[in-house]
UniProtKB/Swiss-Prot annotation:
Cofactor note (record): Binds 1 lipoyl cofactor covalently.
Subunit composition and interactions: The glycine cleavage system is composed of four proteins: P, T, L and H.
Segments forming domain Lipoyl-binding: 24-106
Upper taxonomic lineage: Bacteria, Pseudomonadati, Pseudomonadota, Gammaproteobacteria, Alteromonadales
CDD domains recorded: GCS_H
Gene, per the UniProt record: gcvH
GO cellular component: cytosol; glycine cleavage complex
Protein name: Glycine cleavage system H protein
Pfam family, one: GCV_H
Keyword annotations of the record: Lipoyl
GO BP term, example: glycine decarboxylation via glycine cleavage system
Amino acid sequence: MSNIPADLKYASTHEWVRDEGDGTFTVGISEHAQELLGDMVFVELPDVGDKVATGDDIAVAESVKAASDIYAPMTGEVVAINEDLEDAPETVNNDPYGDGWLFRIKADDSSELDNLLDANTYEASIDED
């Protein structure tokens, strides 16, 4: 069973979102997603300053099994990326909710967070898969 922290919000496409309390939101992929993908070999991240809209494919996680698009869970501007993943993409596997974060978005409208799933709803959605 995958670890699904209750303090995060989730997209149906397996991204997680953490509200940093300052108008920015950290985004990564769920433990469930990284388990499905397998060992990461490369993570292509957006550029700082990129304007993104909810649902845009803005990053790619490449594993030994497949390449998978990563989608923007909120509309806004990318304000930070996890540059450590360039040299250590396996961090996404080892610590998906911590050091394996992907990027941060300054949201245009933080109420978009309400459109995402809570941990229980996300867990129910992956149990159906």
